[in-house]
């Protein structure tokens, strides 16, 4: 696979999978707007979306915040899934149908013309190759994992540590059948377009990538080395996270996510989750000051982990109810 092809894959995945494992990076994801400025798209009608297979039991959790004239539903997504994963539910369908506005992390995530330049600008730096940042032992371990996934340390040497980490983190799941096209975000965005709903992004691809790329080099290297050390367990961790999410086990899904963020380095937790959650909470609070019904679909880690959007809304006096 060529480096250009891998960059194209990165653009697709970074914009969808930013918070969950990059965490999400996803990471995860332009306008001349200040960080946190929302981007809205009046969704053009699209072909009718394929029905979502029904989850067993209650399915993934859904929350709601209400006042006299405003309703905001909060649904935690998984950015990549195996095709055919059964995650649908009547409660999510009803909430989605009732909303006039759909909010996702990044509304322009499918626009390669937007995402690719962002990745190239903030994810590639030939003047400071990985081989000059990592120790000899670290680079050798990285090269071994890269080769096991069809690349090499030399081919990825110009990548900044955060992007190299992301490539490692996604190679295993991709080989195991996970696809961003089957992810919840893509599915719900397609449905929004099919139904002519207004589609909004909490951030732009440029903002999302800048937040991750802006982590300290120390944190980026820790992030990369973590995925190299645990390469054999990446798919198992994602499988377990998806299983917990499908059962509605928010606590377990949050715990598993922390393995890839806060447990590695606090800077990762802050960049991937805390700072973004605070900005999104501000935007949701603004929605509550208006009127109408909105459906928010963001990476599950933003709703299920510590320092979550739900925690922040609760701290501001909002009653967040799980349905």
Where are the predicted features?
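Amphipathic coiled-coil/heptad-repeat helices and related helical stalk/stem segments
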Residues: 58, 88, 184-185, 277-280, ...
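Extracellular/periplasmic catalytic domains that process cell-envelope and extracellular macromolecules
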Residues: 56, 66, 288-290
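A cross-kingdom marker for long, charged
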Residues: 266-323
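Structured, acidic catalytic/metal-binding patches in enzyme active sites
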Residues: 50-53, 61-272
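Residue-level signal for alpha-helical transmembrane segments in multi-pass membrane proteins
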Residues: 25-29, 33, 107
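Bacterial N-terminal signal peptides that target proteins for export
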Residues: 3-25
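Signal peptide processing junction and immediate N-terminal pro/mature segment
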Residues: 30-46
């Amino acid at each position: 696979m060529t480096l250009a092809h891998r960059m194209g894959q990165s653009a697709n995945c970074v914009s969808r999978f930013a918070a969950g494992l990059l965490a999400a990076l996803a990471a995860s994801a332009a306008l001349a707007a200040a960080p946190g400025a929302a981007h809205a798209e009046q969704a053009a009608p699209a072909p009718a979306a394929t029905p979502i297979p029904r989850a067993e039991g209650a399915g993934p959790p859904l929350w709601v915040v209400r006042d006299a004239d405003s309703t905001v539903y909060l649904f935690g997504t998984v950015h990549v899934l195996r095709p055919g994963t059964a995650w649908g539910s009547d409660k999510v369908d009803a909430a989605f149908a009732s909303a006039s506005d759909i909010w996702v992390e990044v509304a322009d995530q499918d626009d390669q013309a937007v995402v690719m330049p962002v990745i190239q600008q903030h994810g590639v730096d030939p003047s400071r190759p990985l081989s000059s940042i990592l120790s000899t032992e670290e680079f050798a371990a990285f090269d071994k994992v890269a080769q096991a996934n069809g690349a090499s340390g030399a081919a990825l040497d110009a990548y900044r540590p955060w992007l190299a980490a992301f490539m490692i983190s996604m190679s295993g799941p991709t080989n195991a059948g996970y696809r961003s096209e089957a992810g919840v975000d893509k599915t719900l965005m397609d449905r929004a377009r099919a139904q002519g709903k207004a589609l909004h992004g909490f951030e732009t691809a440029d903002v999302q990538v800048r937040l991750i790329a802006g982590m300290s080099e120390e944190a980026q290297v820790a992030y990369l080395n973590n995925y190299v050390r645990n390469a054999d367990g990446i798919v198992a961790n994602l499988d377990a996270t998806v299983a917990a999410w499908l059962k509605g086990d928010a606590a377990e899904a949050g715990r598993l996510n922390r393995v890839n963020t806060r447990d590695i380095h606090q800077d990762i937790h802050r960049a991937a989750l805390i700072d973004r959650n605070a900005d999104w909470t501000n935007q949701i609070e603004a929605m509550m000051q208006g009127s109408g019904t909105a459906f928010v679909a963001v990476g599950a880690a933003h709703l299920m982990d510590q320092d979550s959007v739900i925690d922040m809304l609760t701290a501001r006096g909002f009653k967040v109810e799980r349905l």
